[in-house]
Amino acid sequence: MAIINMSDLDLQGKRVLIREDLNVPVSNGVVTSDARLRASLPTIELALANGAAVMVMSHLGRPTEGEYNPEYSMQPVVDYLAKALSCPVRLATDYLDGVDVVVGEVVVFENVRFNVGEGKNNEALSKKMAALCDVYVMDAFGTAHRAQASTHGVGMFAPIACAGPLLAQELDALGKALDNPARPMVAIVGGSKVSTKLTVLESLSGIVDQLVVGGGIANTFIAAAGYNVGKSLYEADLIDEAKRLVANAKSRGADIPVPTDVVVAGEFSPIAAATLKSVSEVADGEMIFDIGPDSAEALAKIIASAGTIVWNGPVGVFEFDQFGEGTKRIAQAIADSKAFSIAGGGDTLAAVDKYGIADKVSYISTGGGAFLEFLEGKELPAVAMLEKRGV
């Protein structure tokens, strides 16, 4: 089934309910990081321009389900949208039994997690949401991996369910990177633990030409190669798993390179003194916090020759500048590359911002967990729903 796109529909005079990911940080009633709000604006503006009466819903934070908590109210988001959009924007607190909305106006529903049954995809709640609209638009890629009432159930019962432009862009970009990638394909997977990204590593090791591992994940692979990792964060029980992934990659002509030099320190601290060492010289009392310049340069060459780059996770503790050079060099190599590049995950996006390469990455994914599950090859419930409701 082909997913229906919002941009293909006649929305004139229609009641359009858009599920966005407006889960943004708020401090003292003010939005402190507006990236997700900015990303949602084109979809809302397109619906308005096409003559729709627009309703928008999202979660914000992790309130206790079914309990109103002013700390997690959507009011700061409403205040932001009222300034960003050239139309009336208001908050609806009691909306499940009906809401008045007219063409040219935006009504933002109060936090969907204040509704009992949201998390468990309750059918009665889903039907109430669906009854509010003529067209349901799923535009929140960041929550597409969750089967909840506002992301999945409502779409099963709405008269029409379609993908918004932001979700469609995400799926197109990820499909381009994974389904038919330009070769060579390089994936960079960082993070603290192999265990949390084992499925991603397994999935990617079967399709990429080079799988670059970083952070605590790399330490487990360094240990698997027979080197001492001292007091570094690593998972001894997954050394055999790391060896298996390396062997599997080699069997299909791919590679999981291990750093040849590393940056170490005796403690995890923003003022810890960084020492450069060969990977074979790490002492028992030391911890690996970054890759060294030789390793970074070798990886930069791999990236320079790539046709497709998928980046999920830094290669060092880049929050501390003395352990950030490896991630900085990789970020620069991606920025300089002519390959199709996609970056996703919270730490990755923080690195993209820190090193100022946002406009040099082909596509920046707004989804954290959803991005990972897509990389794992898992079916995303919201996408499966849109396919089922497609044409």
Curated annotation (Swiss-Prot):
Disulfide-bonded cysteines: none
Binding residue positions for ATP: K197, E319, G345, G346, D347, T348
Entry EC no(s): 2.7.2.3
Keyword ATP-binding: yes
Reaction(s) catalysed by this chain's protein: (2R)-3-phosphoglycerate + ATP = (2R)-3-phospho-glyceroyl phosphate + ADP
GO terms classed as biological process: gluconeogenesis; glycolytic process
Residues that hold substrate according to the record: D21, L22, N23, R36, H59, L60, G61, R62, R113, R146
GO molecular function: ADP binding; ATP binding; phosphoglycerate kinase activity
Pathway: Carbohydrate degradation; glycolysis; pyruvate from D-glyceraldehyde 3-phosphate: step 2/5
SUPFAM superfamilies: Phosphoglycerate kinase
Family designation: Belongs to the phosphoglycerate kinase family.
The name this protein goes by in its record: Phosphoglycerate kinase
Native source organism of the sequence: Shewanella baltica (strain OS155 / ATCC BAA-1091)
Annotated gene: pgk
